[in-house]
């Protein structure tokens, strides 16, 4: 193992992989470390991503596309379904990936670009000098070592331990940490071309339940509920088990995962001296959908681009790295995150009766676009009083 690099990347998910590939292609010496023994496992994601968004970063490949989705459905507590076909659903209809293969492909591309990839290596603490991050102390297959770098990109997922140890505030309020559970199920009867989202406080309080098909009568069936709603007998797994017993009584569960997804605002600042934070660690998960693959790839790539310029200029201070933070906040992604956070804060206050009323009002509508923005516009069109309740969003809905 070498001990000095231009850029050290912590985490082998989509954010880390795109950062490593981009940084290596720019001519930097790059090391990507991953704490697990294998890239892409365990899968901690529903595995969905919009088609156009994916194509911004990688050419789709049948090897890691489990299903090509034709429509999306939102199903209210009383069963009213809002169905969006592919020609109107835009970026929300897309692919269901096989993350085990997809993540490995991304890291493989980073390695081909010249990045060193080291698995079973955990960053235990930042190397700090005069208040700046200068690398990481690691345990590699149980052996301690130091890896020094001009810039560290922390892409270590929801836990965001490295950024916290470097002094950034990464705490997520309990109510904004979704408690999630997911089963990979087979031998179930589903619409193989539709991603389904179920709403309702009896189904998934302050969250939603999803069914994402993966072909051959197989699907990811999962749920996310507010952390403050999770308690004995009412955990995410309990709600999921009840849904499965009712809807897929003869299905077979071949894999189960559990975890948390932050649906808060992004970190107040995603840079420090010698440090950048990307992906889920930066809290750039969509607050409504909980999706984060595309945002992770975007922030990982952007972090590497800015880091490369700073290294070339010989200045990796917080001030020099700040264009990364400013650019993603000013981007379409940053705008959507802020708007969707406000929408999420409103919708978690609704009871099932209000959810049913809103769904029924647009169930037969022909939406011009299927996105959170398109959905809110149509809801306001059908329910004008809603604009008063969403007055904080007025300027973003034009």
From Swiss-Prot:
Principal EC category: oxidoreductase
Homology family: Belongs to the geranylgeranyl reductase family. DGGGPL reductase subfamily.
The protein's Enzyme Commission number: 1.3.7.11
Presence of keyword Flavoprotein: yes
GO MF annotation list: flavin adenine dinucleotide binding; geranylgeranyl reductase activity; oxidoreductase activity, acting on the CH-CH group of donors, iron-sulfur protein as acceptor; oxidoreductase activity, acting on the CH-CH group of donors, NAD or NADP as acceptor
A biological process from GO: membrane lipid biosynthetic process
Biological pathway: Membrane lipid metabolism; glycerophospholipid metabolism
Organism: Methanoculleus marisnigri (strain ATCC 35101 / DSM 1498 / JR1)
Catalysed reaction, written as an equation: a 2,3-bis-O-phytanyl-sn-glycerol 1-phospholipid + 8 oxidized 2[4Fe-4S]-[ferredoxin] = a 2,3-bis-O-(geranylgeranyl)-sn-glycerol 1-phospholipid + 8 reduced 2[4Fe-4S]-[ferredoxin] + 16 H(+); 2,3-bis-O-(phytanyl)-sn-glycerol 1-phosphate + 8 oxidized 2[4Fe-4S]-[ferredoxin] = 2,3-bis-O-(geranylgeranyl)-sn-glycerol 1-phosphate + 8 reduced 2[4Fe-4S]-[ferredoxin] + 16 H(+); a 2,3-bis-O-phytanyl-sn-glycerol 1-phospholipid + 8 A = a 2,3-bis-O-(geranylgeranyl)-sn-glycerol 1-phospholipid + 8 AH2; CDP-2,3-bis-O-(geranylgeranyl)-sn-glycerol + 8 AH2 = CDP-2,3-bis-O-(phytanyl)-sn-glycerol + 8 A
Keyword Oxidoreductase: yes
Residues that coordinate or bind FAD: 15, 34, 45-46, 48, 99, 123, 280, 292-293
Note: Reduction reaction proceeds via syn addition of hydrogen for double bonds.
Protein name in the entry: Digeranylgeranylglycerophospholipid reductase
Cellular component, GO annotation: membrane
Role this protein plays: Is involved in the reduction of 2,3-digeranylgeranylglycerophospholipids (unsaturated archaeols) into 2,3-diphytanylglycerophospholipids (saturated archaeols) in the biosynthesis of archaeal membrane lipids. Catalyzes the formation of archaetidic acid (2,3-di-O-phytanyl-sn-glyceryl phosphate) from 2,3-di-O-geranylgeranylglyceryl phosphate (DGGGP) via the hydrogenation of each double bond of the isoprenoid chains.
Keywords: FAD, Flavoprotein, Lipid biosynthesis, Lipid metabolism, Oxidoreductase, Phospholipid biosynthesis, Phospholipid metabolism
Stored NCBIfam families: GG-red-SF
